[in-house]
Amino acid sequence: MKLTLQQLKVFATIARYGNLGLAANELCLSKGAVSQSLQELERQLSTPLFDRIHPRLQLNNEGRLLQPAAEELLTRMQDIENLFSPDAEPSGQLRLGASQTIGNYLLPTLLASSKQELGLPPKVTINNTHLLCHALANFELDMALIEGENHHPDLLAEPWLQDEMLVVAPPGHQLANKKELSLSRLGGETWVLREAQSGSREQFIQQIQPELPRWQPGLELNTLEAVMLAVEKGLGISFISRLAASDRLADGRLIALPLSRRFPRQLSLIWHKQKYHSTSLRHFIHFCRAQVNNAEVSRPE
């Protein structure tokens, strides 16, 4: 049996896209060449690696077993090539994921610093925590920065920065001048919330909703900016990250209602347990860890 790196590269690319045509475009090969390479790999291994569900190819048990080993080998090969590159700096494009609060309000500062110091040109995907974890589990991302909880057994989450969730309202809200509010006082309010499976929605369901004797769901929006603008316009109140709302709180477009309890939120670095850490990935993780005490990044109160 003589497997080739090209066969493994074709396999890994098909696994990411689930489609021969898309994989062929990514590899700059014909669809026929990609299909032939996969068939030869399956012949050599004496087992199919995908379930053919037209037009998609989904990894079967054998394919899922091969995927982390193939991804690791291909990444190690990239590291070997980098060892002999003229600049000897980390290279290769990292595939980073970020949930919306981090991606919109924290990651730009982080990437500006890491690009200058580390020379990393990452490809960034911004999505909700649930979808990012799904992508990590399928090796579609190298790592992610999330604010929600990880429920996937194949992923490893490392605590990173601290954020805080606030109940925000438009200026002049009837409860704004109260000294201390219990959650039960918010039961009759209309709530503007993020979509299901977002980190902030999950925290609302776990920590806020059970305390409300009654509550009125209002708009459901899939971006933080849309949620905050809706609150500004008087369409309801919301449960929002301090990190996301800081500018609007500072200039008075939003106010934080004075609750009797606080809602801290853990931000985390997360990756697949079987993910090989390339030089670039190791450098970026180290850089992220070094930002814990950086006031510009963590934005403490």
Language-model segments: which ranges?
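A late-sequence structural motif
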Residues: L106, I255-V297
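Central regulatory/effector-binding core of bacterial HTH transcription factors
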Residues: S91-P153
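Alpha-helical linker/hinge and terminal dimerization helices associated
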Residues: L8, Q44-L45, L66-A88
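Flexible hinge/capping segments at coil-to-helix
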Residues: D154-W191
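A short LG(V/I)-centered, amphipathic sequence patch enriched
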Residues: E42-L59
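Secondary-structure junction motif
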Residues: E189-E211, S278-L281, I285, A295-R299
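Hydrophobic hinge/microswitch elements
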Residues: N128-C133, A137-L141, I146-E147, I205-Q206, ...
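Short helix-boundary/capping micro-motifs
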Residues: A12-S30
